[in-house]
C-alpha cells in the first residue's frame, strides 16, 4: 500500500448565509457556502453547558453548485464531503495571504438534510400546475371511489355457496 495520504473532509452543519453562486466564462457554476459546525459539552468544574462554533468555507463546482444555489438558503442543514485545500495569494500590499477551504468537486458529495419543508423542491411552473389541476385530481379520486362502491354493490355475497 502506498503512503500518499488521504485528503477527505466530512461536515454536517448549517449555512450562515444564502449561497453565493457565480458562473465562470465556460458556463460552469461555482457556489460558495459559509457552513457552521458546533460542538457542545458540559464544563466539568461548573456544570455549565458550553458551545464552540467553527465556520468553514465550502466551494462547490458544477451541477452540485447549481443545486445548492437553487435549493439551499441561510439556516439549511447540509452534509458535505470534499477535500481540504489551502490557497495562497498576495494582497494589495504584497503580503502573502492564505485561505483554507473545503472543495467539493467531481468526487465530492453534498446532501440536503433537515426538514423537507424547509426546501422548495418544485419549480414554479409545477406549483401552478398543481394549483390548477388539484380539482381534476380530486374528481378522478371521487370517480374511483364511486366505481369501487358500485362494484361492491353488484357483488352479493349472501348467495349460497355450494361446497
UniProtKB/Swiss-Prot annotation:
Gene Ontology molecular function: single-stranded DNA binding
Membrane-spanning residues: none
Start and end residues of each SSB domain: 6-111
The keyword DNA damage appears for this protein: yes
Extent of motif Important for interaction with partner proteins: 158-163
Gene Ontology CC entries for this record: nucleoid
InterPro entries on file: NA-bd_OB-fold (IPR012340), Primosome_PriB/ssb (IPR000424), ssDNA-bd (IPR011344)
Pfam families: SSB
GO biological process: DNA recombination; DNA repair; DNA replication
Coiled-coil blocks: none
Keyword entries, A-Z: DNA damage, DNA recombination, DNA repair, DNA replication, DNA-binding
Subunit-level organization: Homotetramer.
Function: Plays an important role in DNA replication, recombination and repair. Binds to ssDNA and to an array of partner proteins to recruit them to their sites of action during DNA metabolism.
HAMAP family to which the protein is assigned, alphabetical: SSB
Stated name of the protein: Single-stranded DNA-binding protein
The organism of origin for this protein: Wigglesworthia glossinidia brevipalpis
